[in-house]
A protein has these predicted regions:
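AAA+ P-loop NTPase catalytic core and its hallmark functional loops
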Residues: 1-203
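Short amphipathic alpha-helical segments that mediate assembly, nucleic-acid/protein binding
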Residues: 249, 253, 261, 265, ...
Length: 367
């Protein structure tokens, strides 16, 4: 199959959705790489833009194909009488189609999750959904404004996925998702993944921090999804014990390891020691105009986090903001400033800082 990152797949959308009957698409990839999130966000947004709508104007219906039998998926045959009184069989309307109708939306996405893990009989009845010329299920037409997309794991991922039937694959375009650490780091920064994890991924993402596929041995491994889950535990722990707290022992290490395995956890622990090269929140608050800005991108991310977490009042938030604006990596500076302003808004901290106003005007579109 064609290998492509999410960014590369997204580049196809202006052309893919430039027709009234876009070809169905299947995304194959490892566990936890973000296929579902990509379909719900980037794909939904692109389809909406092609229609002159917003993402919220579109319906979104998810159906997990695995665990369904063919009748449950396509509808159940029931005996009925025709006008002449003769008995005949008629299929009930498929539950999936009822879900689509219940949204009340003219346009939307039907997302068929875990498609490769579905029984072959289910793949067979779903075949017409994957053919834009048929666009139906169990003999019932699907609404013309609804796009069909499926996703699932590869057969090599040890998740119960099988090869898709050939008569299904020649009607769709299939991409095998190639995980991109830089793309994930951008997403993670916008979705409150802890900066220590993002910095570690930036530094070690290309040398085995993330698993390309499940290991041969039966153990936890690091995926984009599992490290995102681990981030919640790390964030809660460091918020309570301080951003410089040791993570090489006790409860926090166990919690992280239970998500990403021992090897990736040790990589994160080793990287966390580098926090000693980054200014502390106290140092930033003491002199935000002169406090050191690290050269390394990963260190800058940690320094920005120190600045954000040092903000406990409106005045300290202004000082943290001043330091953040001095950071030389634009994405880190912008996203950290945005994060800090969310904290300021939640705490109802007012500011008279000219820098904040200038920043908001300059980056209004990004914000």
């Amino acid at each position: 199959h064609t290998l492509a990152t999410f960014s590369q797949i997204e580049e196809t959308f202006p052309y893919h959705f430039a027709t009234s009957t876009p070809q169905p698409m299947i995304l194959l990839g490892g566990t936890g790489v973000g296929k579902t999130s990509f379909v719900y966000t980037q794909m939904r947004k692109a389809l909406a833009e092609s229609l002159g709508l917003t993402a919220d104007d579109l319906g979104f219906v998810v159906e997990k194909m695995a665990g369904r039998d063919a009748q449950e998926f396509a509808g159940t045959p029931l005996p009925v009488k025709d006008k002449a009184g003769r008995h005949q069989m008629e299929y009930t309307k498929p539950p999936l189609l009822l879900k689509v109708e219940q949204t009340g939306k003219e346009f939307g996405i039907i997302f068929l999750d875990e498609a490769p893990a579905a029984d072959q009989s289910v793949q067979k009845v779903a075949r017409d959904m994957f053919d834009r010329n048929e666009h139906s299920l169990g003999g019932w037409p699907l609404p013309q404004g609804w796009f069909v997309c499926a996703a699932g794991n590869r057969s090599s991922d040890k998740s119960g996925a099988n090869r898709l039937l050939a008569h299904l694959t020649d009607t769709v375009c299939i991409y095998e998702v190639q995980q991109s650490v830089p793309d994930w780091c951008i997403w993670a920064d916008k979705n409150d993944v802890h900066p220590l994890i993002i910095a570690c991924a930036t530094q070690h993402g290309e040398d085995g921090f993330f698993a390309e596929m499940p290991p041969a041995s039966y153990e936890q491994y690091n995926s984009f999804r599992s490290i995102t889950n681990a981030s919640v535990h790390l964030t809660n722990y460091l918020n309570k014990h301080g951003q410089d707290a040791d993570i090489n022992k006790g409860v926090v290490k166990r919690m992280i390891e239970s998500n990403i395995g021992s090897v990736a956890t040790q990589t994160l622990v080793n990287f966390s020691v580098l926090r000693e090269h980054v200014p502390t929140g106290l140092q930033i608050q003491a002199d935000p105009e002169m406090c050191e800005i690290p050269d390394n991108t990963g260190y800058q991310m940690l320094a920005a986090n120190s600045a954000v977490t040092s903000a406990v009042t409106a005045d300290s938030a202004d000082r943290a903001f001043l330091y953040i604006l001095r950071i030389t990596t634009a994405d880190i500076s912008i996203n950290s400033a945005r994060r800090l302003q969310k904290i300021m808004a939640l705490n109802d901290w007012s500011t008279n800082s000219v820098l904040v106003s200038q920043f908001n005007q300059k980056y209004a579109e990004a914000l």
